[in-house]
């Protein structure tokens, strides 16, 4: 048993594409459940939207603008009462490229 003050692992995932994010979450949930740990989540967190407005032309026509946006999708997972087998399996897990993972014990 992983000896911590609170017996949970909190995993926060971020990605620009929600489809690969959901695949990564599904892999983590399957791995945790197969090793005997309980899983709370995935909890969808608010999406960060970064908007950038630029002029279409260089020096003229200020009314003609274009907007671009970048969305960062986030999910939160809690793995309750993880065993050593769970920690080892999560360490060996290969997630898709483009998924940022933060782990708090």
UniProtKB/Swiss-Prot annotation:
User: Which key words are in the record?
Assistant: Ribonucleoprotein, Ribosomal protein
Coiled-coil residue windows = none
Q: Which PROSITE patterns does the entry link to? A: RIBOSOMAL_S10 (PS00361)
GO cellular component terms, A-Z: ribonucleoprotein complex; ribosome
Cleaved signal peptide residues: none
MF terms (GO), sorted A to Z: structural constituent of ribosome; tRNA binding
Q: Where are the transmembrane segments?
A: none
Q: How does it assemble?
A: Part of the 30S ribosomal subunit.
Q: What does this protein do?
A: Involved in the binding of tRNA to the ribosomes.
Tell me the protein's name: Small ribosomal subunit protein uS10
The species this protein was found in: Solidesulfovibrio magneticus (strain ATCC 700980 / DSM 13731 / RS-1)
């Amino acid at each position: 048993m992983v000896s911590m003050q609170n017996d949970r692992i909190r995993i926060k995932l971020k990605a620009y594409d929600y489809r690969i994010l959901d695949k990564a979450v599904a892999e983590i949930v399957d791995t945790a459940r197969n090793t005997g740990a309980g899983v709370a989540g995935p909890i969808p967190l608010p999406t960060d939207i970064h908007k950038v407005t630029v002029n279409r032309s260089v020096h003229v026509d200020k009314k003609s603008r274009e907007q671009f946006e970048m969305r960062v999708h986030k999910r939160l997972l809690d793995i309750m009462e993880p065993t050593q087998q769970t920690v080892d399996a999560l360490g060996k897990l290969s997630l898709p490229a483009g998924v940022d993972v933060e782990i708090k014990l």
